[in-house]
UniProtKB/Swiss-Prot annotation:
GO cellular component: endoplasmic reticulum membrane; mitochondrial inner membrane; mitochondrial outer membrane; mitochondrion; plasma membrane
Region of interest: Important for mitochondrial localization: 80-120
Membrane topology, record value: Peripheral membrane protein
Subcellular location: Mitochondrion outer membrane
Enzyme class: transferase
Organism: Mus musculus
Family statement: Belongs to the GPAT/DAPAT family.
Gene: Gpam
Coiled coil: none
Protein name, as recorded: Glycerol-3-phosphate acyltransferase 1, mitochondrial
Function according to Swiss-Prot or TrEMBL: Mitochondrial membrane protein that catalyzes the essential first step of biosynthesis of glycerolipids such as triglycerides, phosphatidic acids and lysophosphatidic acids. Esterifies acyl-group from acyl-coenzyme A (acyl-CoA) to the sn-1 position of glycerol-3-phosphate, to produce lysophosphatidic acid. Has a narrow hydrophobic binding cleft that selects for a linear acyl chain. Catalytic activity is higher for substrates with a 16-carbon acyl chain.
Length: 827
């Protein structure tokens, strides 16, 4: 039942004392100076843990630096060596020292004095937006085109009436779209949020050095583009509140029109929010609404021209899985087009990471169980506020990444000799169906020499914007601090699913915390490990069962096994998945390669040897398979490169060791491996810029590796494999379900049937991981099958219809798809 602590063994142990920016066992309202609150843990710390915490606590990493490869000039800009040492600040801790006044009355009125002294006035914000947008050339052309469609053969008088009608429609759309920022409303909301946030959050932490970089960026008189991850509805208010507290003007926030509800919509407009449709193609016949697109484009251009700040959520909607979702770059493309048209000199891009101990929504179990999303209403907002006031949601951490120049990024990308990326079908089909002729890859083999690098080329423009969006989301996700609830939920699901004594859980929590810091991710908590664990368990609530044992002052902690509870734990556990995802991919690939070697008849000690090249290729193919689960790596790196680097880390950890030369000479690839190697060099998984002297040289590719058999390393590999267990089980179950496919069938209907199948597996205890039945994984699996060519998608009366492609009509090919996915699944 009890397992030893998770560790990777020989990681660099140059530990440094950590700064005590904030601690869970201390007062909520303190800032730089902390005072003990007398919180006592429920059991005594062991001497071993005391020794570890005093000697092994790492220094916090500084997160959010921009990409040196893509934006080398921005890397040096706004940053100086003293910034990381500025430390953290609790934004909602306000007293008279944060105002110009002192004394008893100032202490009583500190919130009012603070918001009154903030620098916010009408002159900061955009003016005459509606008239300027309506008079822009693009909008005028769209109005004329729509009017011509309404009255194709009419007289000049009728045409004039049609134009006036379209103009009235355009003005009505802009009334919903254009925000009218009110400094008074911002101040009032700032005061209200200080009260509310102090009621249901312990604190909201920001890094003072990061805010210094943002302030420096505001002094350039360039538009700023804030691009946060999207976890909760509070995200909309959080950024505006933090910037207001630091005398930075509020950004204009792109909000979905589902929030356009009475009273609440007026508040959002006054705070800088503007509503946009979730789908731009909303004409009755399904065509592009050119008028709406022109107005949206003109609105964004006008805001940027007036040097306003924008806030866009690239994910489009709140993440229901706890992972950062894939980017939707629609509005970002408007920003890129504005810069490309030389309307403004440059735009500074700021990715933002946001982490919650517990989101105010609590969970998204209803939607993950397949229930339709409830429409927002004034009543639902009021109920949400009342519910929030009854609970405490712990800690919030907001991280602003280093601003980088969008102009520098775009110019750099247009000069890079990078070939067109492979589609998922081109990348994965040779691995799934190795006997199939690889005609598709051959057609694109020499694409790098003929490909247009002109930003005016539509295909290149789309890829450029998609890569930019992935780059931003990867940086924002990398900046997200890991919260205590993330680590505890992860340990309970994938380390101690059958339960664990609290003392052992605390030990494992401490070790995992150190592993997170070792990978250059920051933590959203500090303090004694047992205090932090108890804090997390309290926030996880009914998802965790606590049982008193016969041992004095000891408790047994068990994760709840009900489907909603497992879904909720998985949501919070996914907050730490991106820290270990590449290592988890390598761990599953090790299993796949060893399993294939064993099934191929290898025996004895040589059967444990792995070709490094084969392992890297296997891992790269798994990266492609999981690419719909979020941004796995920076787009300026190939999957091959990232996997190769991660294998190098495994060698550094001691999990993999390079085999002796005598052993390597005794190993020769089997026939299947030779065919695999012949096929894959045609695929551009490696960068064209690699040279013979790089780490990817032939001497590296030819080496063989041994897997460490130490208990410590084997347990860590098992932990990593379990992290991907729910994803791989969902994908393999979807592949099983494809065997009985009878189509064509509407995609929505197929999603419901597949989801019902996965839920049934869970209810009957067939599933190893109950969380494999979440609706998010169902959608991602079906999307992956469309991307790799299992399904063909057609539109019938604006409804997406699925049918099997000719490649996967034979049952044998569907079986190979299943076998390919199962090769990574550790039973």
């Amino acid at each position: 039942m009890e397992e030893s602590s998770v560790t990777v063994g020989t990681i660099d142990v140059s530990y440094l004392p950590s700064s005590s920016e904030y601690s869970l066992g201390r007062c909520k309202h303190t800032s730089e100076d902390w005072v003990d609150c007398g919180f006592k843990p429920t059991f005594f710390r062991s001497a071993t843990l005391k020794w570890k915490e005093s000697l092994m606590s790492r220094k916090r990493p500084f997160v959010g630096r921009c990409c040196y490869s893509c934006t080398p000039q921005s890397w040096e800009r706004f940053f100086n060596p003293s910034i990381p040492s500025l430390g953290l600040r609790n934004v909602i801790y306000i007293n008279e020292t944060h105002t110009r006044h002192r004394g008893w009355l100032a202490r009583r009125l500190s919130y009012i004095l603070f918001v009154q002294e903030r620098d916010v006035h009408k002159g900061m914000f955009a003016t005459s937006v509606t008239e300027n947008v309506l008079s822009s050339s693009r909008v005028q052309e769209a109005i004329a085109e729509v009017a011509a469609e309404l009255n194709p053969d009419g007289s000049a008088q009728q045409q004039s009436k049609a134009i006036q009608k379209v103009k009235r429609k355009a003005r009505k759309i802009l009334q919903e779209m254009v925000a009218t920022v009110s400094p008074g409303m911002i101040r009032l909301t700032g005061w209200v949020l200080l009260k509310l946030f102090n009621s249901f959050f312990w604190n909201i932490q920001i890094h003072k050095g990061q805010l210094e970089m943002v302030k420096a960026a505001t002094e350039t008189n360039l538009p700023l583009l804030f691009l946060p991850v999207h976890r909760s509805h509070i995200d909309y208010l959080l950024l505006t509140f933090i910037l207001f507290c630091h005398n930075i003007k509020a950004p204009y926030i792109a909000s979905g029109n589902n929030l356009n509800i009475p009273v609440f919509s007026t508040l959002i407009h006054k705070l800088g929010g503007f509503f946009i449709r979730r789908r731009l193609d909303e004409t009755p016949d399904g065509r592009k609404d050119i008028l709406y697109r022109a107005l949206l484009h003109g609105h964004v251009v006008e805001l940027l021209r007036q040097q306003q700040f924008l806030e866009i959520f690239l994910e489009g909607t709140r993440s229901r899985s706890g992972k950062t979702s894939c980017a939707r770059a629609g509005l970002l493309s408007v920003v890129v087009d504005t810069l490309s048209s030389n309307t403004i000199p440059d735009i500074l891009v700021i990715p933002v990471g946001i982490s919650y101990d517990r989101i105010i929504e609590g969970h998204y179990n209803g939607e993950q169980l397949g229930k339709p999303k409830k429409n927002e209403s004034l009543w639902s907002v009021a109920r949400g506020v009342i519910r929030m006031l009854r609970k405490n949601y712990g800690y919030v951490r907001v991280d602003f990444a280093q601003p980088f120049s969008l102009k520098e990024y775009l110019e750099g990308q247009s000069q890079k000799p990078v070939s067109a990326p492979l589609s998922l079908e081109q990348a994965l089909l040779p691995a799934i169906l190795p006997s199939r002729p690889n005609d598709v890859a051959d057609e694109h083999q020499d694409l790098s020499s003929n490909e247009s690098r002109n930003p005016a080329d539509e295909a290149f423009r789309r890829r450029l914007i998609a890569n930019l969006a992935e780059h931003i989301l990867f940086t924002a996700s990398k900046s997200c601090a890991i919260m205590s609830t993330h680590i505890v939920a992860c340990l309970l699901l994938y380390r101690h699913r059958q339960g664990i004594h609290l003392s052992t859980l605390v030990e494992d929590f401490f070790v995992m915390k150190e592993e997170v810091l070792a990978r250059d991710f920051d933590l959203g908590f500090s303090g004694n490990s047992e205090d932090v664990v108890m804090h997390a368990i309290q926030l996880l609530g009914n998802c965790v069962t606590i049982t008193h044992t016969s041992r004095k002052d000891e408790f047994f902690i068990t994760p709840s096994t009900t489907v909603p509870s497992v879904f909720e734990l998985n949501f919070y556990s996914n907050g730490v998945l991106h820290v270990f995802i590449m290592e988890a991919i390598i761990a599953c690939s090790i299993y796949a390669v060893l399993n294939k070697r064993c099934s191929g008849g290898s025996a004895g000690g040589l059967g444990n040897l792995i070709s490094q090249e084969q392992l890297v290729r296997k891992a790269a193919s798994l990266c492609y398979l999981l690419s719909n689960e979020g941004t796995i790596s920076l787009p300026c790196q190939t999957f091959y490169q990232v996997c190769h680097e991660t294998v190098g880390k495994f060698i550094q950890y001691g999990i993999l060791t390079v085999a002796e030369q005598d052993d390597q000479e005794d190993v020769s690839p089997g026939l299947a491996e030779q065919q695999w190697d012949k096929k894959l060099p045609e695929l551009n998984w490696r960068s064209d810029e690699e040279d013979e002297d790089s780490d990817f040289g032939e001497e590296q590719r030819d080496c063989y590796l041994k897997v460490s058999q130490s208990k410590e390393h084997q347990q860590f590999i098992t932990f990593l494999q379990r992290l991907l267990g729910p994803l791989l089980e969902a994908y393999s179950s979807a592949a099983i379900f494809v065997h009985n496919f009878s189509g064509p069938v509407p995609e929505s209907e197929y999603l419901q049937k597949l989801h019902r199948y996965l839920i049934t597996r869970t209810e009957r205890n067939v599933a190893v991981y109950a969380e494999s039945a979440t609706y998010c994984l169902v959608k991602n699996a079906v999307k992956m099958f469309k991307d790799i060519g299992v399904f063909k998608e057609t539109k019938q009366k604006r409804v997406s219809v699925l049918e099997l492609s000719s490649t996967f009509l034979p049952q044998c090919n569907r079986q190979k798809l299943l076998e390919y996915i199962l090769s990574f699944v550790v039973l």
